[in-house]
Amino acid sequence: DDDALLLEKGIVRWPEILEFTGRLTVTLEDGHRIDYGAQTYGAYINSETVKHAASVTADGIRRVLFIENKANYVWYISQKPAGDELVILHGGCYSPIKGRWFRLVYEGCRRQSHAAEYLHWGDVDVGGFRMFRRLKEQIVPELAPYRMDRVSLEQYRDQAMWITSEAYLKTLEDMENDLEYEVFREVIGMMRVERIRL
């Protein structure tokens, strides 16, 4: 076991910290339950706990919002999301353990008596589009983008960054013609013409 070898040499891996806020209860393999519902200012679960989680129960969640960017996540939860909303820090290219957490949460929300809406708020750039696609393909097939459209790019144009790389523009062109990214076609077209990303 790699971890045992590292421990033998005095090297310990730190657990990943996963952030969210919303009415969730985690049931561990040993039957203990952890209720996060009261932690409306932000909750945390570490990767070791996720490894030993048997299931997640959602309580009246009608909307699940994954947020890529930590600054956006902190701002969003400071606005006091509705009680029926679950907000999860996506944090970029997720690890296998974070993928397990997302899957447990998704399964818990799917077991509710009513359907929830699943949204992803990522950067309006190549990475954000790829992260959306990966989450949709691997875990949440109902996923829809949030604030990743032409209107958002126009609204926050003053915060946009210039695209100077021809290779980046070529990647956008390929995405614009790829049915896997069809939901972003309009915003990608604007990005290519104006050479900006958000």
Residue ranges and their predicted role:
Residues 1-89, 94-108, 127, 133-137, ...:
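Nucleic-acid enzyme cleavage-core boundary/entry regions
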Residues 113-125:
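Acidic beta-strand-to-loop metal/phosphate-binding motif
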